[in-house]
UniProtKB/Swiss-Prot annotation:
Transmembrane segments: none
Cofactor binding: number and manner: Binds 3 Mg(2+) ions per subunit.
Pathway where it operates: Secondary metabolite biosynthesis; terpenoid biosynthesis
Cofactor: Mg(2+)
Function: Terpene synthase that catalyzes the biosynthesis of the terpene valerianol.
Disulphides: none
Record-given protein name: Valerianol synthase TPS8
Amino acid sequence: MASSQVGDMVNGNAEPTRHLAKFPPSLWGDRFTSFTLDKQLWDKYGNEIEVLKEQVRSMVVAGGRKAAEQINLINVLERLGVSYHFEKEIEEQLEQLFAKFEDNEDYDLFTIALHFRIFRQHGYKMSCDVFNKFRDSNGEFKETVSNDVQGMLSLYEATYLKIRGEGFLDEAHAFTIAQLESLVGGPHLSSDLSEQVMHALKQSIHRGFPRLEAKHFISFYEKDASRNETLLRLAKLDFNQLQLSHREELCHIFRWWKELDLISKVPYARDRAVECFFWSTCAYYEPQHSVGRAVLTKIMLLLSVTDDTYDAYGTYDELKLYTNAVQRWDVSAMDELPDYMKALYRALLNVYDEVERDLAKQGRDYGVHHSKEAFKEIVRSYEIEAEWFKEGYVASFEEYMKNALVTSTGRLHTTSCFMGLEADVATTEAFEWILTKPKMVAASGAIGRLVDDVMSHDEEQERGHVATGLDCYMKQHGVSKQEAIVELYKMIENAWRDINEEMLKPTAISMKLLIRVLNLSRISDVVYKYVDGYTHPEIIKDHVISLFEDPIPM
């Protein structure tokens, strides 16, 4: 997102030239200003949820079920969005299932691919060799595969768990997409199955926003003749109760942002309180992480305005002053800043003080220092891009990416996200791990940076913008824009492969932490899939309404 425009003072006193972005305004008005939680409805949902949870827990741990049936139950729980209630029981079951798995079982493609996806999602490195029996002597898929729509759909979803060196999964990905696309809307698919296929082709399970995907799956599962009514009821109640919590939290955040009144002082910036909360809810949606969602949202909002200050308003001289002030992190530095920057700087210091006080009450404020240092690092990199723009410099792609992996916010978002987790999960060692520049955090940052570079390129260049990764690659390699886009998407796919590999056991840190990095990567896939949905929030408006406003009919 970040780069810069500049404009030097003309004749000493004239207003400097500013390359204003004219970002779209907030969509929401006062829509989320007030919300009263219906405590009676909340309690009603909660009481029934507790009863159903115990029934489902008994189902998960019950013996006598075949392995294929058990893996399918786990899959349904995950896709319905209720597996977080049974994490311990599911992990115990998967450990046993993986240890006993035999690929010589007479499993069909759907079942094999389902095992592969679920095991990989939980860190178990199942080999691609399990798919060999579906290929002929020439290595091509057998004709029977093309006739198995459910099997192809299951394989398609499994291919998103690929790591580097797994060429078969690349082939399977291309094959299943081609086959499924040819079947959509045709006479061989029921309308319900066709709808599932179309949604899967638009948004894979592995890269989707977990809560949104759960809501989609609930609507599909409701039409499944083999559905389990207990699971369906639990999923609906759980979604609706959690939606009430999220809506109440969003109301608090929205009011806080309005009272802060920062946008009135920096009207050039994007006003995106709702979208930042949406982003934070992807990082962690579970009810116990309400503090984390608030912390992450507030820091993201400050970063967004800071980004726009460097990207679409501040002059180079002003930006140098602001960079120095952030490095000092002291209220006395405010005296050197222009008035509009004083408002932003004051908000930055105050919000971090507020966050530190809130986390100190729970004994987990030790991560705040790491978040501050990450913020300082990003601002330094923003200034580098401002200088590049001022000089008209087009960096080599390697030089660009070295700086872009900082401005991609991977370290800051990961650090700030970890601050909202339990102290026994987000330990001091976890924050020290981030400082080692781990491959997974770098990969997550690369995904966000490169997909944003592609999706926002034309608009940013039109108003005046530092050379993006797309520009740097085109110049260095002498290729067209379309050729460069193809290469950047190859890099994005490799970054996803790295994320998948880093989540295979044994992992460097707890899976409870790694899943947050994965979730931060997922939001890039959702928000920037077709256009920059953060800058143009109408693109994700339906997602926001679905997640925070529209309950599931009971």
